[in-house]
């Protein structure tokens, strides 16, 4: 809008009003700051600014804002300050005289010698040197407390909800101080404070699952090998997951894998899938475990569906079909019955299987030197003759 010859970028009045409607402030002071922010944004809309000021005056008469106003903690933005903020022109003495005259009229019962002004910044003057010494002292105290954290735990002396009169409910330590912890030269190797808050996801540190970097490298390698974009790769991953549910993730797989496009079969080479799968394809597909589990549940909601992995093990309980694939990821939340069924199927799948480190050597010929000496009296080339005796 144009104000006093200047074009000023402004929000729409509705956006300014939405600032007033913001009521998720944690402290009453934050609510007052939001109203002052709306005043700043409303400058240029004279009617809107007037209504905001009247609303602010009404708010300061309500609890708990009335107490903040009495303590001088309620912020105020004058018209002169807003004008100077937007135009960059400093306030003149005539404009400031208006506020000075009103202030004197409100305090006409006091003379100049009795009038006392209180500013919001009521902090004492700070000595930089003393402040730095205080910080160094506090830092040394914290370091000393950190060294003694493994030896002594200071009890909390604050009154809490468990306190009744002069009696307090004892608090048990999460980690006992009597534990035998590893130490070097008398200093503990563990940070107990960090250990109490270190609760990583089991999947993130499990050796049975490929790391996130390995999964990303596999995805990027397969995508480049198939020469597809990210959206097409999503469809390929869908088909690969369903194919692996039926056919497994053995390292002996070779040839091609298949997915359906309507009634038409579409084949893809398995070589890129296996080549970029580090450490193994089963560890890569473990990231798809929960998605595969949900997919089997979805199929069973419309028809009886048992993956081939379960059919081969003669699994008759369709309630366990969701666990009948070889890249299923066991977790702490897996039911005991499902865990037993999965482990039995896994044991049956690997029963009698043997892996040979070396195959048959292709160079099967033997080069031997025959050192046997025969004479004309020998019976044949394999038998000797000595004085009529045959050996």
UniProtKB/Swiss-Prot annotation:
Composition-biased stretches (Basic and acidic residues): 127-145
Gene Ontology MF term list: RNA-directed RNA polymerase activity
Post-translational modification: Genome polyprotein of potyviruses undergoes post-translational proteolytic processing by the main proteinase NIa-pro resulting in the production of at least ten individual proteins. The P1 proteinase and the HC-pro cleave only their respective C-termini autocatalytically. 6K1 is essential for proper proteolytic separation of P3 from CI.
A Pfam short name: Poty_coat
EC number: 2.7.7.48
Reaction catalysed by this enzyme: RNA(n) + a ribonucleoside 5'-triphosphate = RNA(n+1) + diphosphate
InterPro entries, sorted: DNA/RNA_pol_sf, Poty_coat
Keywords: Capsid protein, Nucleotidyltransferase, RNA-directed RNA polymerase, Transferase, Viral RNA replication, Virion
Any one annotated GO CC term: viral capsid
Family, per entry: Belongs to the potyviridae genome polyprotein family.
Protein name (record): Genome polyprotein
Organism: Clover yellow vein virus
